Swiss-Prot record:
Monomer. FMN binds at A58, G59, A60, D61, K62, T82, N135, N168, K213, G241, G264, G293, Y314, S315. Binds 1 FMN per subunit. Catalyzes the conversion of dihydroorotate to orotate with quinone as electron acceptor. It catalyses: (S)-dihydroorotate + a quinone = orotate + a quinol. It is a peripheral membrane protein. Pfam families: DHO_dh. This is Dihydroorotate dehydrogenase (quinone). The active site is at S171. The gene is pyrD.
Length: 335
């Protein structure tokens, strides 16, 4: 069934196909029946109860429009966003490119979204009863030295409506954003956001975990530095990781020359290495959510065995369809 749907979708350019899929899932979310069953493979992470360990990665549903539709595919959790304080168009089109031979995707979207207020309203309307994470970022026009302001604005607005909040400082498509992963800039950001989280937990009388999303392109030394900051500031979890700027796995393939972040199967080895290195540095101090290149039960289990407690998928679903989510959710064994 999905092979036919995929043929139709792949007649469109990547972004048009994505937008069509979001609208179809938005419609499916309103139907009174499940598209696919919710596989029960429960796990507790960050004090939250997940029906299964397979989540939708951020970037798929930037505005939270299709939460109920994605929920009907069997995801144990859904992360919406990345969202910014005000709406922005993102980078010029075309900005999404398929690498068919490798089942990869390059995007340089640039946090295109309708703004945090629209996302919050969509989350409030959603009937999905799984875990919802909200991924927050900064507007492109905000100077990097004022990035904290944007993260604080978003954190305050989404806190009441999220089960956990992810701070995205690792997209390669917003100028200078990745500099927040290093040294004093990271320290200042984590310290301030942790303080804000504590204030909000008192205000709403409920603690919501704070998660950091990092890049797979970090060196071992940089990973160690990030891990140290996560532990010192008592951050609740880390997503490893975002898209890569490396083209080593796709050299010579059609569309590999485009600028942007590479995701999908070509990212698998790099993301597993990030998880493994991070796990050694953290030594169980906080959970890792594995993301990047998961395209089979074997590749997903490899990330669990490397140290991840949960997994997120997006690009592989574009190539393989929702059956992948069902297989992962049923067969992944969390240690």
């Amino acid at each position: 069934m999905y092979s036919l749907i995929r043929k139709c979708l792949f007649l469109m350019d990547a972004e048009t196909a994505h937008n069509f899929s979001i609208q179809a899932l938005k419609l499916a979310g309103k139907l009174p029946i499940n598209v696919l069953p919710m596989p029960l493979n429960p796990v507790e992470v960050m004090g939250l109860q997940f029906k299964n360990p397979i989540g939708l990665a951020a970037g798929a549903d930037k505005n939270g429009e299709a939460i109920d539709g994605f929920g009907k595919l069997g995801f144990g959790f859904i992360e919406v966003g990345t969202v910014t304080p005000v709406a922005q168009d993102g980078n010029p089109k075309p900005r999404q490119f398929r690498i068919l031979e490798a089942e990869g995707i390059i995007n340089r979207n640039g946090f295109n979204n309708l703004g945090v207020d629209v996302l919050v309203e969509n989350v409030k309307k959603a009937k999905y009863d799984g875990i919802i994470g909200i991924n927050i970022g900064k507007n492109a026009v905000t100077p990097i030295e004022r990035a904290l302001d944007d993260y604080q604005i978003c954190l305050r607005k989404v806190y009441e409506h999220a089960d956990y909040i992810t701070v995205n400082i690792s997209s390669p498509n917003t100028k200078n954003l990745r500099t927040l992963q290093y040294g004093e800039a990271l320290d200042d950001l984590l310290r301030s956001l942790k303080s804000e989280q504590e204030s909000l937990s008192q205000k709403f009388n409920r603690y919501k975990p704070l998660v950091l999303k990092i890049a797979p392109d970090l060196t071992d030394e940089e990973i160690a530095s990030v891990a140290d900051g996560l532990v010192r500031h008592k951050i609740d979890g880390v997503i490893a990781g975002n898209t890569t700027l490396s083209r080593d796995p796709v050299v010579g393939l059609k569309n590999a020359e485009h600028q942007g972040g590479l995701s999908g199967n070509p990212l698998n080895t790099l993301s597993t290495r990030l998880i493994s290195t991070l796990a050694k540095e953290l030594n169980g101090a906080l959970p890792i959510i594995g993301s990047g290149g998961i395209h089979s039960v074997a590749s997903g289990q490899e990330k669990i065995d490397a140290g991840a407690s949960l997994l997120q998928v997006y690009s592989a679903m574009i190539y393989q369809g929702p059956a992948l989510i069902q297989n992962l959710a049923k067969h992944i064994q969390v240690r």
